[in-house]
Design a protein with these regions (language model features):
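Contiguous, structured surface segment used for ligand recognition
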Residues: 5-143, 477, 489-527
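Feature activates predominantly on carbohydrate-active enzymes
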Residues: 79-299, 303-312, 464-469
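Flexible, acidic glycine-rich loops studded with aromatic residues
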Residues: 368-374, 381-387, 393-529
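Active-site neighborhood of glycoside hydrolase catalytic domains
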Residues: 257-263, 267, 274-387, 392-401, ...
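Flexible loop/turn segments at secondary-structure boundaries
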Residues: 39-40, 156-158, 184-190, 251-257, ...
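Conserved, mostly hydrophobic/aromatic
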Residues: 31, 99, 148, 169, ...
Length: 529
């Protein structure tokens, strides 16, 4: 009988029991799927059935007679939305869940019990002797938010790579793709009301970003997603139960937007403005006192709510220098009008206007707002506590501060969850940030709720890995730095703390090297030895 470690499920289920015997596939199977809200569960199973047949040739047909079914998907209304039960015996595979997401995650687990080529979608003719270990699994995520953020403002990767990233997330039951689409160095999403955002803001005169001895290379570089592209990617993610959270970083980190429309976004429109060619933090922020800038932000949000039919929009809020506001007469006048002497409160005021505007929209277009934790430096009482704080710098303290104010929070600590940083001290590591201390082990061993009072824990909605791309220009480097650290964060988001063990994880994740190779994904091979 196999051990749980030999079965190698990642993330580790909440409860796993290995039993005697095996389920033999054969060449054909019958399945019974419980109807639910039209065909929503059946559509999840049809996708699995197609993948299984393409990879193995095994045909699955439908039956309404449970006695004839060898795979059964049965509704269990008592289970939480993403929870499932999976029972594999000698005779049948039985899955219970209350929502399509639970059935999807159960089928992801079922694929992990199979040879890795099924998960990879790679065909094989050698399936006649296939079997599954007999197991009983009761599983549910620890946190509702299990996220990954990709910065494409600095470097653009394109539609195909984004789908690969979504595939990586789906394998490990992650459910939030935070898409950082705007930066000082580039604006990556088509906004029809403001075409110059992509005509001008999506392009710059250097692929590499200047830093220290690294100088601009003069190469015309950029790219953006059309609204057609966005809709295609959203549809792709929805099939994998991943919500996409667009981030439009305003009013800071906005030099690309300012370069596109300096006449109403710049604090100093008389000066030259261009898409930034450097790393670091630009002082060229949006003039929040210009009514046309406020209108711009509202109309960008209008298009975002049409493109992303999910619950959240991220408006940034980090690293917003106030230097140009301090020199701008309009901004100084506005600060006086709102009764403050803290220029950071201009940012909070700006967000308050946008939050109030979103509240006037039809119910299906209203969105909850997320901000980086620097907004806590301003008078957040203006905003209210019905916002979410994404804690990255001084993350543990910031998350507690937000929770004490009654705000939901997501942990994305710079150390160790910034997985764009070097993952080892090996000389073969690609050029990136960090000193190689954000190893897989360091990422895995971070405990999200360590020293958090029980009364505050309900405000902690989950965890997120972040990937900033100042140094990363190629998909192969992106993937190398992501894998397998992404899986370590995924397990923190899914698996109960008492079930987590790094040595066990390391043995399980090594078996995914075959999956990565079959998918053609780059990864940290030194970790898999």
């Amino acid at each position: 009988m196999l051990t749980a470690q030999e079965i190698a499920l990642t993330p580790q289920p909440a409860h796993l029991t290995v039993k005697d015997g095996r389920f033999e596939f054969g060449n054909q199977l019958k399945a019974k799927v419980t109807p639910y809200q039209g065909d929503s569960i059946r559509m999840v199973f049809e996708s699995f059935k197609k993948e299984l047949q393409e990879a193995t040739g095994i045909k699955v047909s439908s039956t309404q007679k449970e006695a004839k079914a060898r795979i059964i998907l049965d509704l269990n209304p008592q289970l939480p939305a993403e929870a499932y039960k999976l029972n594999v015996s000698k005779k049948q595979v039985r899955i219970e869940a209350s929502r399509p997401a639970g059935f999807y995650y159960a089928l992801q687990t079922l694929k992990q019990l199979m040879p890795r080529n099924v998960m990879a979608g790679v065909a094989t003719s050698d399936h006649s002797q296939w079997s599954l270990p007999s197991v009983e699994i009761e599983d549910a995520p620890r946190f509702e938010w299990r996220g990954f953020m990709l910065d494409e403002g600095r470097h653009f990767f394109g539609k195909d790579e984004i789908k690969r990233v979504i595939d990586m997330m789906a394998i490990y039951k992650m459910n939030r793709f935070h898409w950082h689409l705007t930066e000082d160095q580039g604006w990556r999403i088509e906004i029809k009301k403001y075409p110059k955002l992509t005509e001008t803001g999506a392009w710059r005169n250097s692929k590499v970003l200047a830093y220290g001895d690294v100088k601009p290379d003069g190469e015309r570089y950029g790219g953006f997603y059309t609204q057609k592209d966005i809709k295609e990617i959203v549809a792709y993610a929805k099939k994998k139960f991943i919500e996409i959270i667009p981030e439009i970083d305003i009013p800071g980190h906005s030099q690309a937007a300012v370069a596109a429309y300096p006449e109403f976004l710049a604090c100093d429109p008389e000066n030259k403005h261009e898409v930034w060619l450097q790393q670091g933090i630009s002082t060229d922020v949006i003039n929040v006192a210009n009514p046309k800038a406020m209108q711009f932000a509202k109309e960008v949000i209008d298009e975002l709510t049409e493109l992303f039919p999910f619950n959240y929009i991220h408006l940034g809020g980090d690293e917003c220098p106030t230097r140009k506001w301090q020199k701008n007469d309009e901004c100084k006048k506005l600060l006086s009008e709102i009764g403050s002497s803290n220029f950071r409160d201009l940012q909070i005021y700006f967000y308050k206007q946008l939050k109030d505007y979103i509240a006037t929209k039809p119910a299906d277009q209203q969105r909850q707002l997320i901000f980086w934790n620097e907004v806590l430096h301003g008078n957040t009482s203006i905003l209210g506590n019905d916002i979410t704080i994404m804690a990255w710098i001084g993350a543990n303290a910031a998350a507690k501060q937000a929770a004490k104010q009654g705000m939901n929070t997501i942990l994305s600590p710079q150390i160790p969850y910034y997985i764009n940083r070097k993952q080892s001290k090996l000389p073969t590591e690609p050029m990136s940030q960090g000193h190689g201390t954000e190893t897989v082990e360091a990422v895995y061993n971070y405990q999200p709720l360590k020293d958090v009072d029980a009364a505050l824990q309900p405000y902690y909605k989950g965890v997120q890995a972040n990937f900033w791309t100042e140094w990363v220009t190629e998909p192969s480097v992106l993937e190398y730095l992501m894998l397998p650290r992404l899986a370590a964060v995924a397990e923190a988001g899914w698996t109960p703390q008492e079930k987590r063990n790094y040595e066990d994880f390391k043995e399980r994740i090594r078996k995914d090297a075959e999956l990565y190779d079959l998918k053609g994904w780059n990864y940290g091979k030194h970790i898999m030895k």
